[in-house]
């Protein structure tokens, strides 16, 4: 990861995970440089992984494109949700060890 803006997303995602106590957290940077964070939501009637949740938050804010997304915690399964909206977006996962995948 060579982009310092992506490193900021790592910080946002890991701090959101630590603060929330959720299983997953994700941080997204849109094409204008604005950032969004979200965690997974799990209940009997609703299941969103962190990718789905952060995409929902960003879309509700009126984004027109995605540059990069970082997730941490347990690995979200639905990277396709991001790639469907922004096929060229960079998507990273940060393992508990700190390794960027």
Description of each model-found segment:
Residues 28, 47-48, 69, 97:
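Residue-level detector of alpha-helical recognition elements and their boundaries
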Residues 43-59:
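A short, polar/charged loop-to-alpha-helix boundary motif
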